């Protein structure tokens, strides 16, 4: 509830459960905001030009979606920077980190790719943003000259590498080169861990049998491909004594391997995504009760992503366990969608009317639904605490990726917030794609019932989402680029061999 009056602060928020670190501060807490920054947190009333009464709902830091793909050249039917970030404030997200990509294995100029991406993003973002970079050819020019330049001048302190996909796949030796370089620079390494040879081997066998419907995407990328690659990249990380983040983890076995490393104080971090908590491979099948258009035999293509949706609820429960016990460090969307009904989108997988999963662009939409899904199905059901939720969606991404002004509610931090309805205050609803703000013609979570949704989203002290009074208040020029520092999560253990010094 909004009110206006005279006061010393630009905005005051009060009467909510304020989630700060491991604590939940009582509704008697007042937060005073001035110049886009949190200036005071008080147990006594504060006055402001604008007042938000949270009416007993949770007040949390603005969400950080640290794994999104926007305006990528290889996905012409995907979300642009403008359409993708438009969906961030309505879902409680105030900062996203998409990827600038090395254009090809022959391209030695990563700096130009970043500068080009800056041009794409400028005045096209509804929320704040930073950049990761994807490296597909770790030559000396990039590792010794360009990465230091990007870290120092652009504040880019994270690199993603792949063990799969022909365009991006690196050898173990190349991964080691990057890990050693990133250790020296204090850069976070993100790794997509799947065994490419296993995937290629099974894919050939499926093609020989003409098994190419969307469902066979999940068969072609079995859990063992993720399990083996996870063990391998952890071994490489230990050899160089450098932390890594393994992205979009879906396998309980792979997550147990991460847990074992963590229990031995090895700094291995894990990310998972909504699809690995809520969707199974049944959605990929020719006929599925969850499909919106049950008469469309190709609808399963909407759910193609990698790693793929897993086979059973038990496997999803294993990922939930890793969320609950602290194995998972960050919860991201891996928003990488393409329009379904488009010849360059998901329908690219229909060749002369014959489905072929290998030709379907990978990826699902998810920026807007990420935080509401975990809040409704995690916090409100008691599967996780509000504090754990904030760790996963806000504070840990900020720490891991060097967003020093984001991710927590504290004096001096950016005034980024998401405010939820008090439990039971909002009428439940069933999601349809028409309710969302992205540029994609479907959501994998259509048909899911939501019991809560962000009531307000606030970015640097400005209300950018007011669900009850005006909806989206941000514009495409609202977002600002955020230069990042190094990770503040646990780092190297000091065990680097003299060979690599």
Show which residues each predicted segment covers.
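N-terminal metal-binding scaffold of metallo-dependent hydrolase/deaminase domains
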Residues: 1-47
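Divalent metal-coordination and catalytic microenvironments
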Residues: 16, 31, 36, 56, ...
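C-terminal cap of metal-dependent C-N hydrolases
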Residues: 16, 344-362, 411-482
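Metal-associated gating/positioning segment near the N- to mid-region
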Residues: 54-124
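Divalent metal-binding segments
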Residues: 69-79, 94-111, 130-145, 161-173, ...
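Alpha-helix-loop-beta-strand connector modules within alpha/beta enzyme cores
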Residues: 110-127, 177-191
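Histidine/acidic residue-rich metal-binding segments in metalloenzymes
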Residues: 144-331, 347, 352
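His/Asp/Glu-enriched, well-ordered alpha-helical/loop segment
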Residues: 212-241, 290, 296-303, 330-331, ...
């Amino acid at each position: 509830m909004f009110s206006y009056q005279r006061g010393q602060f630009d905005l005051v928020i009060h009467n909510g459960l304020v989630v700060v670190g491991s604590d939940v501060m009582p509704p008697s807490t007042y937060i005073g905001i001035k110049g886009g920054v949190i200036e005071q947190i008080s147990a006594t009333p504060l006055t402001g030009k604008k007042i938000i009464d949270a009416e007993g709902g949770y007040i949390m830091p603005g969400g950080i979606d640290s794994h999104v793909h926007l305006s990528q050249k290889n996905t012409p039917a995907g979300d642009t920077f403008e359409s993708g970030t438009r969906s961030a404030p309505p879902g409680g997200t105030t900062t996203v980190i998409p990827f600038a990509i090395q254009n090809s294995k022959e391209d030695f100029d990563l700096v130009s790719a970043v500068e080009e991406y800056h041009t794409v993003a400028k005045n096209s973002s509804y929320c704040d943003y930073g950049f990761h970079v994807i490296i597909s050819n770790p030559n000396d020019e990039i590792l010794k000259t360009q990465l230091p330049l990007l870290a120092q001048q652009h504040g880019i302190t994270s690199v993603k590498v792949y063990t799969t996909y022909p365009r991006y796949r690196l050898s173990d030796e190349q991964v080691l080169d990057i890990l050693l370089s990133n250790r020296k620079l204090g850069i976070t390494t993100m790794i997509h861990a799947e065994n490419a040879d296993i995937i290629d081997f099974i894919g050939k066998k499926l093609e020989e049998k003409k098994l190419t419907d969307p469902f066979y995407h999940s068969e072609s990328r079995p859990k063992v491909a993720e399990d083996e690659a996870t063990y391998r990249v952890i071994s490489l990380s230990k050899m160089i004594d450098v932390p890594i983040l393994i992205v979009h983890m879906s396998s309980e076995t792979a997550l147990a391997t991460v847990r074992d490393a963590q229990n031995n104080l090895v700094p291995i971090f894990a990310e998972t995504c909504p699809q690995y908590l809520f969707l199974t491979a049944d959605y990929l099948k020719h006929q599925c009760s969850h499909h919106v258009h049950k008469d469309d035999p190709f609808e399963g293509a909407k759910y193609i992503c990698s790693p793929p949706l897993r086979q059973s609820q038990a496997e999803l429960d294993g990922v939930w366990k890793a969320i609950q016990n602290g194995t998972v460090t960050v919860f991201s969307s891996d928003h990488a969608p393409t329009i379904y009904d488009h010849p360059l989108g998901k329908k690219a997988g229909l060749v002369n009317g014959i489905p072929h999963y290998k030709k379907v662009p990978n990826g699902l939409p998810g920026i807007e639904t990420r935080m509401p899904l975990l809040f409704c199905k995690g916090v409100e059901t008691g599967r996780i605490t509000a504090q754990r939720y904030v760790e996963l969606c806000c504070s840990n991404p900020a720490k891991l990726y060097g967003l020093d002004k984001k991710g927590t509610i504290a004096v001096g931090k950016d005034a980024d917030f998401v405010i939820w309805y008090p439990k039971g205050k909002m009428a439940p609803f069933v999601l349809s794609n028409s309710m969302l703000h992205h540029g994609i013609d479907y959501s994998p979570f259509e048909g899911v019932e939501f019991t809560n949704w962000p009531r307000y989203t606030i970015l640097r002290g400005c209300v950018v989402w007011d669900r009850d009074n005006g909806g989206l208040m941000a514009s495409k020029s609202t977002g600002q680029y955020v230069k990042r520092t190094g990770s503040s999560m646990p780092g190297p253990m000091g065990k680097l061999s003299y060979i690599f010094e």
